């Protein structure tokens, strides 16, 4: 035995009833929503993300019909309000900078509202990699397509 172990059992004669119940209750759920085919997966603190963005950006002329732009899944991006900038004419663009990478979301009123509900934030992100060049400075960016937010104070 080990701590927090749990188990359940069901009488074999009740399996058909369980299947009918589960099928009825879960029929309206699309289990493929929020599913993404990603090409890369990294923890936010992984040191190779910057180089990966530079490497992928070298091939940006390849993406198009029949060759989709690669996506990356970033796990465990932990940050606070000091790492966030709200930008743009309409103040609806979010820029989160952490570990030398800028995570960008445009038209992000909902995200801005969600971020305001927490002091410490943990996010998982799916996005596309990009390089931003501004006055000779090149910054690796990830444009956020989808995200999950958790209260960073409760995450471990």
List each language-model region with its residue ranges.
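Acidic, two-metal ion nucleic-acid-processing modules in DNA metabolism proteins
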Residues: 1-156
């Amino acid at each position: 035995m080990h701590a927090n172990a749990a188990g359940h059992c069901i009488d074999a004669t009740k399996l058909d009833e369980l299947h009918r119940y589960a099928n009825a209750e879960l029929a309206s759920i699309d289990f493929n929503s929020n599913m993404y085919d990603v090409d890369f997966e990294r923890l936010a603190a992984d040191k190779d993300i910057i180089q990966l963005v530079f490497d992928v950006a070298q091939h940006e002329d390849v993406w198009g019909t029949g060759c989709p732009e690669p996506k990356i899944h970033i796990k465990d991006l932990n940050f606070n309000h000091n790492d966030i900038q709200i930008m743009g004419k309409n103040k609806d663009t979010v820029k989160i900078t952490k570990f030398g990478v800028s995570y960008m979301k445009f038209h992000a009123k909902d995200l801005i509202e969600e971020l305001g509900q927490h002091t410490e934030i943990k996010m998982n992100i799916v996005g596309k990699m990009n390089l931003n060049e501004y006055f000779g400075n090149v910054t690796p960016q990830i444009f956020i397509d989808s995200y999950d937010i958790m209260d960073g104070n409760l995450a471990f």
